[in-house]
Structure formats: structure tokens, C-alpha cells
């Protein structure tokens, strides 16, 4: 069972800046129900700071964690928002024991700030706790007949996506569009031209992936660039939309890490997230569970699930279809981290460095201030 209560006060670990204090005002709290005496609380509290998309999955995992010996006396405070904004807020002092962010570079910022150990990604899954794929959300009946990436740059097709300047989800979207060209025989110049045409068609450039979904559900645009799990979760919430899994797309790999001065229970939490029950809950909320041997391929039997258990999937018999060309950071873009593409695509031009290809495409489209 999960109940709500007020967030715990700021700890003495880091002095929060005004930015961190403002963000903390929006924090939600989940608490595992225990059997302690009425009015008394001996709970240890884990502060989770994450990007917006996995909030429902983390809530479900917390409910299962509360049933274990390690989690029965553990409560949670949570804060969710755009990945880059959340990472910067933690660096500025927002209280956190565990971060669940969209891209590894947002964790790297915390490593450089001395808040997360440099060994955070040394485990068998290299710091990744959840995965999904980039899909193309469309209107009922797919009136624009969107079958893949090339349809998004046609005249009259209106696209909704988050802004890569604030959103990690948007960076995965842009990387998938880039890879559609470069990993199918195109040159980087052709890929840059494709991105320019794509952002010319963007009609809503939101702060986070969740905001992009909300915008699309509100009637904006013809196509939504989204995580597959966002489409599945929307259907679970009675707001489903059709989506296309492109023949070429990217495996989204979301990192999780505990902070250097985290409460001891945070390590138990991370172990649970990476374990069978944690990954099972991710699957039930539309994420593709971790699979080191075959990334992006779901082994239902190992999780005690049947395909039909994934409510809201477009095809109940095949909720996580095999992608013909599933690109990964490590194999296709100079990974395992973002170093091979971060500055090339998303450089902000500070300190005299050149602006990235995606940054320029957005500026040239006139959408940078949306």
C-alpha cells in the first residue's frame, strides 16, 4: 500500500539554492505503509529525483519494495521533471538519495559535482535501470499515413517533441532521427539536413517528455516523438493513442544512481529496481526490461509474465515488437556514454565551442524560444 505525506525537511547534506528550493515545492511523497505505532515514525526516507516519464513505474516499484524486509520501514520523497533540469537542481542542492534520469550525461554532471561516485556505471548493466524505444505517436486511424521517419519531414505534418535543451527524452528522439539517416547509408550532412526539416515541422517544443505527451493528448500536432512506454501508459490511463515503431529506432537507456551521501536504504532500493520484481513492474508500465544479452528483447518468462499482462500495448500478443534495426549508444554512436554525440548534436555554444547540429536545427527553425 502507498500513502502520501508531507516531504521531509531539507537535510544538512547540501545547502539548496533558490532553484532547488523552488523545485522541491513540487515534490510528491510516497510512503510504504508499515505496522508502527500510531503517531510514531521510525522510517528511513529515500529521496528520489527523476525525469518525468518513469514516475508511475517508480511508484509501482515502491509499493512492491514496501512488502520486503528491506523496504517495510522505508518511505519516499519524490521530485519529477525534465531530466536536465532535475540534474542541475541536484547539483545546485536539491536533496536526493537516488536519481533516475533520462541520459547518462545528466548523471555525469553529478559525478563532476562530487555527488555521485565515478564508479556508478561499473555494474553489469553499466548504470542503466530502465529501457524503452523511440516511437511515433499518431492520431486515431493514422490519417497522415505515417509509417516511418521520412514521413515526418513531409509538408503539412505537424510534429510534437520535447526540447533537447531541457529534456533527456528529446535527446533520444533526436538521436533516433539522426541515426535513421546515418545508420542507413546517409552522410552526416544528409542527417543534418533531415533534422533541419524535422524541426521545421515541429509545432510544440515542450520542456519534458511528459509535457510533450500532454500537449499531443490535448490535440496539438499530428505526430508525437515519444517513448514506447509513454504510449502504453497513456492507454492504461484511458488516453491511448496509436503509435508506429519505426524500422530503425534507438534503444533508450535510462540511468539510475545513488548519491555518495545517500541514506543506506538507497542501496537496497537500487538492488530491488535492478532485480526481477523491479524490472517486472517496469514491464507492466510499458518499459522494456533490462536484457544484457539481447537489449530491447523482452524475456517474459523470466519475469513471470505473459505478453497479455502488458495492458495498453498496441498489440496485446506482441507488446514489445522486435525492432529490425535497433540502434544503441555503445554499438552505433561511440558509447557506452554520450561522449561520441553529445557535443556534436547538442552542444550549446558556450565558452567558444561550436553549437551542435540539433541545437542549430532548432534555432534555424525558429522554435528555440517555444
Describe these PLM feature segments.
Residues 63-68, 150-210:
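Ligand-binding cleft/hinge of the Venus flytrap
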Residues 3-20:
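Bacterial N-terminal signal peptides that target proteins for export
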Residues 39-166, 304, 362, 366-367:
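N-terminal segment of the mature folded domain
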Residues 27-32:
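C-terminal motif of bacterial Sec signal peptides marking the signal peptidase cleavage site
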Residues 184-249, 255:
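Ligand-binding pocket segment of bilobal, Venus flytrap-like solute-binding proteins
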Residues 34-37:
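Bacterial signal peptide processing site
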Residues 3-5, 263-370:
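Extracellular/periplasmic juxtamembrane helices and adjacent flexible linkers that interface
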Residues 128-136, 195-198, 205-206, 236-267, ...:
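Periplasmic-binding protein-like
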Amino acid at each position: 500500500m502507498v500513502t502520501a505525506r508531507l516531504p521531509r525537511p531539507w537535510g544538512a547534506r547540501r545547502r539548496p539554492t533558490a532553484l532547488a528550493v523552488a523545485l522541491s515545492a513540487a515534490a510528491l511523497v510516497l510512503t510504504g505503509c508499515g505496522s508502527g505505532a500510531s503517531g510514531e515514525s521510525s522510517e528511513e526516507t529515500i529521496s528520489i529525483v527523476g525525469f518525468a516519464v518513469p514516475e508511475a513505474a517508480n511508484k509501482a516499484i515502491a509499493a512492491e519494495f514496501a512488502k520486503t524486509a528491506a523496504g517495510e520501514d522505508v518511505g519516499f520523497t519524490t521530485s519529477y521533471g525534465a531530466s536536465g533540469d532535475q540534474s542541475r537542481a541536484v547539483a545546485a542542492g536539491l536533496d536526493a538519495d537516488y536519481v533516475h534520469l533520462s541520459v547518462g550525461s545528466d548523471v555525469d554532471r553529478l559525478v563532476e559535482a562530487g555527488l555521485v561516485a565515478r564508479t556508478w556505471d561499473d555494474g553489469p548493466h553499466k548504470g542503466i535501470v530502465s529501457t524503452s524505444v523511440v516511437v511515433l505517436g499518431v492520431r486515431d486511424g493514422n490519417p497522415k499515413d505515417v509509417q516511418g521517419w521520412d514521413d515526418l519531414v513531409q509538408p503539412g505534418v505537424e510534429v510534437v517533441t520535447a526540447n533537447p535543451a531541457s529534456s533527456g527524452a528529446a535527446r533520444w528522439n533526436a538521436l533516433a532521427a539522426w541515426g535513421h539517416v546515418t545508420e542507413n547509408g546517409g552522410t552526416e550532412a544528409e542527417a543534418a539536413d533531415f533534422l533541419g526539416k524535422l524541426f521545421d515541422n515541429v509545432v510544440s517544443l515542450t520542456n519534458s517528455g511528459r509535457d510533450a505527451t500532454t500537449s499531443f493528448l490535448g490535440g496539438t500536432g499530428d505526430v508525437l516523438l515519444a517513448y514506447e512506454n509513454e504510449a502504453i501508459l497513456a492507454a492504461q490511463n484511458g488516453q491511448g493513442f496509436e503509435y508506429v515503431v519505426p524500422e530503425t529506432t534507438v534503444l533508450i537507456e535510462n540511468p539510475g544512481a545513488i548519491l555518495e551521501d545517500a541514506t543506506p536504504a538507497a542501496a537496497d532500493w537500487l538492488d530491488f529496481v535492478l532485480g526481477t520484481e523491479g524490472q517486472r513492474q517496469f514491464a507492466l508500465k510499458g518499459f522494456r526490461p533490462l536484457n544484457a544479452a539481447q537489449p530491447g528483447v523482452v524475456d517474459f518468462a523470466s519475469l513471470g509474465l505473459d505478453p497479455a499482462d502488458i495492458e495498453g500495448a498496441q498489440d496485446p500478443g506482441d507488446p514489445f515488437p522486435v525492432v529490425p534495426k535497433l540502434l544503441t549508444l555503445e554499438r552505433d554512436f561511440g558509447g557506452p556514454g554520450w561522449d561520441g554525440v553529445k557535443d556534436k548534436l547538442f552542444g550549446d555554444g558556450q565558452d567558444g565551442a561550436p553549437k551542435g547540429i540539433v541545437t542549430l536545427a532548432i534555432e534555424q527553425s525558429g522554435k528555440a524560444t517555444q
